[in-house]
């Protein structure tokens, strides 16, 4: 077998016609263990047996603490509109520029192998392999999230995860925790809405959720929100009965639909839009633009088309390109930066940290995560470091090595920051207006479906009357008629 002497990366393209050990020695019998006589005890010297069983016992890696259930596909992103006035990002430099991507869709709460018909947010993560490094855009199929401060992220996930005693998901825990956080209301108006269970991944919207920053070549910084719209339209499963039927027939229906569609040449496609806000104008709005529980009104901040995403190739190996695929919002490129969005700031650390736990400190060396452009730093050694290096200098600065600091394509605009060190909530929480507006935008049938789903969940026998009353009051603050409808369905009285 011919091996690459510099990269040391084994590949199935180098497969031999006979079985070997991991070290390359031929295996003459892969059917029987080495024993003393045909019935005798197994000998410890059967190295191949020990290696085979030991490797099998270690095939699984820790699953993601969230978004464990998912499916990936590969393709390209093509810039279709001139956005150079907004950002100096190289892959958006001109219409027609194509960038390779890999995309992972997922559910959030439950384990690998769980049904893909659960009422649960869906992840929509895109890795762009640009000429200036990888950019990861992580989002969901809802434009908002349950909380606005990352310090509560472990708590909200614990509340949605199965009960630690029974390992059964129970919504009384969700309602108990989030009754203390009315900011969560807006996301419930998506979760219990018709979009709560997408029919599959191809007919699903995506949203960046958090607020990012575009930086232009002139040094102008503007807030930006990202939106993915499927060109084939949005489809959802409207009833829990249909979801149970689809999920009962095939727990992997969305994964199979994605794979089969691409294999048949019916390539899923999305259009990327952005909303852009000048930070100098943020005070004119009745919400905080850095609050991820809020949407930006499209009549005031219209969607602007940027490009199209096409998935035209299935993964070659599910483990290598799905389980080992690692995303993190900390991966940005020149022209795209973070904002002071509290959830985003926390995610920048948390995602990289969870990948180091799942995959090891050198997870960005894995082929699916590695950049496609030349790169160089002094991050040496560590577990499973398989990068060939022959430099003598592993520090900076040095007169004996060519490594230099990169000159920024455009400096980040200076932004004075002043204030006291404090733990505090934002000034404009405004938690009830947008949920109420969303509810009133629906037709009567859609409102009724929302009421039924929400009330049925509140009707769980372990949800106390006190807790139901709290939620009825919260919903009534969004819309008085909604509070009345929920109360009526639960045979309770709304406190208006």
Curated annotation (Swiss-Prot):
Q: Name one GO molecular function term.
A: catalase activity
* Positions contributing to heme binding: 351
Q: Which PROSITE patterns match?
A: CATALASE_1, CATALASE_2, CATALASE_3
Reaction(s) catalysed (UniProt annotation):
2 H2O2 = O2 + 2 H2O
What ranges does the record list as Polar residues composition bias?
9-23
What cystine linkages occur within this chain? Answer: none
Any idea of its EC number? 1.11.1.6
Provide the GO biological process annotations. Answer: circadian rhythm; cold acclimation; hydrogen peroxide catabolic process; response to auxin; response to hydrogen peroxide; response to oxidative stress; response to reactive oxygen species; response to xenobiotic stimulus
Q: Which CDD domains match?
A: catalase_clade_1 (cd08154)
Q: What class of enzyme is it?
A: oxidoreductase
Q: Which family does it belong to?
A: Belongs to the catalase family.
Quaternary data: Homotetramer.
Q: What is this protein called?
A: Catalase isozyme 3
Q: Which organism is it from?
A: Zea mays (Maize)
């Amino acid at each position: 077998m011919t091996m690459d002497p510099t990269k040391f990366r084994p590949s199935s393209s180098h497969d031999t016609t006979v079985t070997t050990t991991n070290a390359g020695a031929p295996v003459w019998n892969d059917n029987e263990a080495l024993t003393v006589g045909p019935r005798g005890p197994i000998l410890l010297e059967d190295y191949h047996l020990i290696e085979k069983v030991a490797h099998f016992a270690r095939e699984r890696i820790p699953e993601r603490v969230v978004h464990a259930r998912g499916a990936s596909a590969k393709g390209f992103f093509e810039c279709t509109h001139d956005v150079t006035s907004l950002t100096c990002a190289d892959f958006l430099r001109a219409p027609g520029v194509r960038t390779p991507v890999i995309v992972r869709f997922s559910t959030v709460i439950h384990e690998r192998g769980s049904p893909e018909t659960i009422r649960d947010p869906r992840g929509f993560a895109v890795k762009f392999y640009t000429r200036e490094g990888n950019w990861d855009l992580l989002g969901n199929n809802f434009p908002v999230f349950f909380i606005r401060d990352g310090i509560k992220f472990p708590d909200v996930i614990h509340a949605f995860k199965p009960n630690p005693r029974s390992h059964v998901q129970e919504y009384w825990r969700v309602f108990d925790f989030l009754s203390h956080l009315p900011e969560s209301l807006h996301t419930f108006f998506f979760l219990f809405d018709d979009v709560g269970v997408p029919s599959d991944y191809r007919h699903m919207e995506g949203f960046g959720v958090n607020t990012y920053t575009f930086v232009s070549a002139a040094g102008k910084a503007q807030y930006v929100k990202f939106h993915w719209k499927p060109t084939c339209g949005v489809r959802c499963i409207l009833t829990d009965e249909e979801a149970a039927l689809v999920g009962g027939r095939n727990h992997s229906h969305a994964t199979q639909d994605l794979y089969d569609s691409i294999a048949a040449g019916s390539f899923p496609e999305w259009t990327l839009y952005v909303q852009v806000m000048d930070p100098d104008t943020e005070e004119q709005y009745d919400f905080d633009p850095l609050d991820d529980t809020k949407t930006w009104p499209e009549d005031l901040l219209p969607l602007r088309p940027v490009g199209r995403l096409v998935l035209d190739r299935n993964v070659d190996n599910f483990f290598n390109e799905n389980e080992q695929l690692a995303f993190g919002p900390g991966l940005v490129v020149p022209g795209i930066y973070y904002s002071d969005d509290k959830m985003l700031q926390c995610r920048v650390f948390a995602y990289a940290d969870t990948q180091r736990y799942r995959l090891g400190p050198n997870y960005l060396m894995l082929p699916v995560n590695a950049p496609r452009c030349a790169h160089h730093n002094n991050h040496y050694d560590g577990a499973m470091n398989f990068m060939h290096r022959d430099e003598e200098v592993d520090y900076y600065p040095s007169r004996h090595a060519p490594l230099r600091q990169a000159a920024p394509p455009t400096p980040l605009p200076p932004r004075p920051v002043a204030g006291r060190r404090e733990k505090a909530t934002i000034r404009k929480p405004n938690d009830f207006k947008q949920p109420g507006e969303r509810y009133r935008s629906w037709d009567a049938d859609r409102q009724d479906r929302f009421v039924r789903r929400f009330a049925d969940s509140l009707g769980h026998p372990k949800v106390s009357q006190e807790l139901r009353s709290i939620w009825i009051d919260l919903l009534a603050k969004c819309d008085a008629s909604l509070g009345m409808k929920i109360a009526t369905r639960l045979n309770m009285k709304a406190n208006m």
